[in-house]
Amino acid sequence: NRRYIGNKHKLIEWIFSILDKECDKSGSFVDIFAGTGVVAAVAARHFDEIVLNDFLHSNHAIYQAFFSKGEWSREKIDNIIKDYNNINGEDLEDNYFSENFGGKYFSKNSSKIIGFIRENIEENKANLTDKEYYILISSLLYSIDKVANTVGHYDAYFKKNYIEDGFFMR
């Protein structure tokens, strides 16, 4: 579950009640404003092909993780995430993410961990299948949303004296 302004989750029942009446549930389903993909996830149970559209690159990564066909190893992903969750932010040097987002959107330590993980995924991309790469990126995105010091978008953050460390990748 991601924090997202457009939340279509509440509309799913209504959307599919209309589709039940008006459409042959086979062939293709196109989600023009796919957002987090919540509508497409339900449509995937009913249609042969799903086409998703969104202008955010982060959403493209999530679509690849959830909807693309491809080889991946759950054990490999679980082990990588386990290793990431054993990282202590105090042991890391500052990185692009911590310098730009630490102390505002995230605690300094959480932002160092997030930045390290993002760089590490990219550095190890050659050792991952495309699906594994996008699963890790998506897991990072969802985990970031859980600890973000925002209301769901990154135009502004809560101005606090203390931001709790709490990053944990799922």
Predicted regions and their residues:
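Conserved aromatic-histidine-acidic binding/catalytic patches
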Residues: 3, 7, 31, 102, ...
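Class I S-adenosyl-L-methionine-dependent methyltransferase module
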Residues: 49-51, 55-170
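S-adenosyl-L-methionine
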Residues: 1-28, 38-46, 62, 69
